[in-house]
UniProtKB/Swiss-Prot annotation:
PROSITE patterns: ABC_TRANSPORTER_1, ABC_TRANSPORTER_2, CBIO. This is Energy-coupling factor transporter ATP-binding protein EcfA1. Gene3D superfamilies: P-loop containing nucleotide triphosphate hydrolases (3.40.50.300). Its EC number is 7.-.-.-. Disulfide bonds: none annotated. Transmembrane segments: none annotated. The gene is ecfA1. ATP binds at residues 42-49. ATP-binding (A) component of a common energy-coupling factor (ECF) ABC-transporter complex. Unlike classic ABC transporters this ECF transporter provides the energy necessary to transport a number of different substrates. CDD domains: ABC_cobalt_CbiO_domain1. Forms a stable energy-coupling factor (ECF) transporter complex composed of 2 membrane-embedded substrate-binding proteins (S component), 2 ATP-binding proteins (A component) and 2 transmembrane proteins (T component). It comes from Mycoplasma pneumoniae (strain ATCC 29342 / M129 / Subtype 1) (Mycoplasmoides pneumoniae).
Length: 274
């Protein structure tokens, strides 16, 4: 059972961020906790991926604070940040630097000063968790999309971070691979990890403990999926992709809609012109 009286794993407090004159994040405040599976959703350009870059220290907030287990993120505590946060991207190819999968996982452990035996034990353990034991001697770039994502997950697990971010990590996968990764997110939450998924995937959202809805850089709704997505009409108001919204509403609450195809196209056009 999630206990939100404890210290937040990650906390945004009044955060602002912009590129030049274009504000991407506006007065953003929220907390996420260990043992919590959180989905961040919103239309393209709503600020979702900017959140992951701020969390991982790739971007610096221009106002407000971001804390990881109570410690404010800054350029002076990058090591602390890397010890607590892992991220799996949409396309993990750029993360692969080893000749084999085993080499790739081992690379991230080199700064930990483990013995060779300890490192081997960790690699074998995370490979088993991610279901890639038979891939350890393969070349990462020759694997399928789903296999690459599982290798990326194993590499993150080897470092044992408390917070794991999935940034659109299932969007390019086939249905079977998607199911595998989504189930893994749930398992990680059950192990006590704080799992943050930036996604458009309906099934991911319905399995989350909490959903954050972003719109034009603002957090406009948050809560349990059944509370946030309580009607098709509400979903349309917050400028999420409408086909996604309608199917999600039906999935979560059994909501149906009589909107026809032409109305749908017109509605999408009006929303995206705003």
């Amino acid at each position: 059972m999630l206990n939100t009286n404890k210290q937040a794993a990650a906390s945004f407090q009044g955060v602002y961020f912009s590129y030049s004159e274009l504000p991407l994040i506006r007065n953003l405040s929220f907390d996420v906790f260990e043992g919590e599976y959180v989905c961040i959703v919103g239309h393209n350009g709503s600020g979702k991926s900017t959140i992951s870059k701020l969390l991982t220290g790739l971007l610096k907030p221009q106002a407000g604070t971001i804390k990881i287990f109570g410690k404010t993120i800054s350029s002076e505590n990058v090591t602390y940040l890397r010890n607590h946060i892992g991220i799996i991207f949409q396309n993990p190819d750029n993360q692969f630097i080893g000749i084999t999968v085993e080499d790739d996982i081992a690379f991230g452990l080199e700064n930990r000063r483990y013995t060779r035996e300890k490192m081997k034990s960790i690699i074998e353990d995370v490979a088993q968790q991610a279901g890639i034991t038979e891939l350890l001697q393969k070349e990462p770039h020759n694997l399928s999309g789903g296999q690459k994502q599982r290798v990326a997950i194993a590499s993150v697990l080897a470092l044992n971070p408390a917070i794991i971010i999935f940034d659109e990590s299932t969007s390019m996968l086939d249905p079977k691979a998607k199911r595998t990764i989504k189930q893994f997110m749930v398992e990680l939450r059950n192990q006590g990890k704080c799992v943050i998924s930036i996604t458009h995937d309906m099934e991911e959202v319905t399995k989350a403990d909490k959903v954050l809805v972003m719109n034009e850089g603002r957090l406009i709704r948050q809560g349990k999926p059944k509370d946030v997505f309580n009607s098709a009409a509400e979903l349309q108001k917050i400028r999420l992709d409408i086909p996604f919204s309608l199917s999600l509403s039906t999935k979560v609450n059994g909501v149906t809609s009589t909107i026809d195809y032409q109305q749908l196209i017109e509605a999408i056009g009006k929303l995206w012109k705003k």
